[in-house]
Amino acid sequence: MLSPRYWIFLFIVLAAIGFSMLKLSEEPEIITSPADPYSYRYMQLENGLKVLLVNTPDSDKASAAMSVNVGSMDDPAGRQGLAHFLEHMLFLGTEPFPEPDEYQQFIKQNGGSHNAFTSYAQTTYFFDIDNEQLPGALDRFAPFFISPAFNAEYVDREKNAVHAEYSSNLKEDGRRIFSAQKMAMNPEFGFSEFATGNLDTLSDRPDSKIRDELIHFYETHYSSDRMTLVIAGNYELDQLANWARGHFSTVPQRDVSFSRPDVPVFVPEQLPLDMNIEPVKEIRRLQFTFPLPEVESQYAYKPVSLLSNLIGHEGEGSILALLKQKGWAESLSAGRSLSTEHASTLAVTIGLTREGLVHVDDITRILMRYIELLKEQPLPEYLKEEQKLLNEMMFRYQEHGQLSDYVIRLSSNMLLFPEQDIIYGNYRAELPSNELMQRYLAGLSPENMLRTLVAPGVVTDTTDPWYDTNIRIRPSDYNNEREVEGLDTLHLPAANPFIPEDFSMSPDPATDTPEILISTTERQVWYYPEHDFQMPKSQA
């Protein structure tokens, strides 16, 4: 007969197993593509830093990226470009490696590259390097986020580098248009500010030194719980995990609360607006910008992506097909142009012909009529299904591309998606409800738009103070009651019969030599299957 002590011991063991299984089940598994040769591990360090480790078998390169949830829209008032300037300064020495070019030289001498960028809501630092040199690169990279030198003798030098970057873009139309359109935004919305920085915005002032403000900004925003790190290389995940802990566990977690103000992108009472921008080059463009509710929380349904795909459709019955028929446009694109935790915008950009310049109101009416079609009844389910199927196909057969680009993408995704969707989040497309679609469709109206005409010789009456671009902003006088011939030809896309649903591979044995399938005087078609990843792609 078994003793009571045995049963007590058995109970404790089973309870421990059950508890460990519960903990394992609570840990979300990262969703990966069936064709993905990499393996992954997510972990969170004790200081709150979120880390993704990527084992890349057979790779001769390693890479890492750190994203910080702070960007140019978080610049202090009157210090435009401070976040960007800070990005520059972190490259100029740390306590363990004080020489300003130590990191750069080590990366360069070991077959690598490095860079960083500051967007409106995040700042990302990254490098790639010969795989065997990853430990040394991490030695030099981690102190950026622990003990940067902020050496005073390099502050002026780097201010000049930022100003040179600004000056080099003064005649670049993309920057000029981007900056000019901010003048129509709500001045309380952080994105509306100048982002690059120059000698004026980054100068010392009687009441503040720029180095002191840099350090204060760093100590306010560069906190481990607002950072995401990706380390990728041809190493076992356990080894990568040891390096992550060893190098980054001392990144400080700062006791500073942070939230961005919840203010509208545009002042609602000022919409709709018409804006003219005079470019440097021969550009003719009409853009419609619609402020919408935030969409980041709806990433699993992608309502704005679905609307963008429909508006940007180029086939029969589309906006572009009618505009081309009339000779008014050459191209049309639609997509989300801004996204924060509080707001988003959808932009429709139309490349105009010379004739199209005199039909701006007619073009507007065609766009609005198509949007009315989207609103008149619930979207057909096949359109939602097609978005889901296409995204699933892209996810299933995704290619990583250059390793450094991939780790940048992953570190950015970690700021947006829960752990299980770090890879899948960009592709996940559940079927959105009709109510959700109507929520975003409601914002696509002639009363809720900034209409921007970019063309040589447009009427202007003021200038953008940062790029000296000639512009004009005024209340829109567009009348949506106008009649335009051909509106009745607009309709939603028919179901696409060419989207596959069965991805199973043919059991025919793979050939080791290319086979010619078609050979004529006009063309040759060869068949040679890809053996490793079985990707259903062709190259012409």
Kindly label every feature range from the protein language model.
Residues M1-L2:
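N-terminal secretory signal peptides that target proteins for export/translocation
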Residues Y6-L14, G18-E102, P135, D139-F141, ...:
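His/Glu-rich zincin catalytic helix
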Residues S257-P264, H359-A510:
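Non-catalytic interaction/regulatory segments
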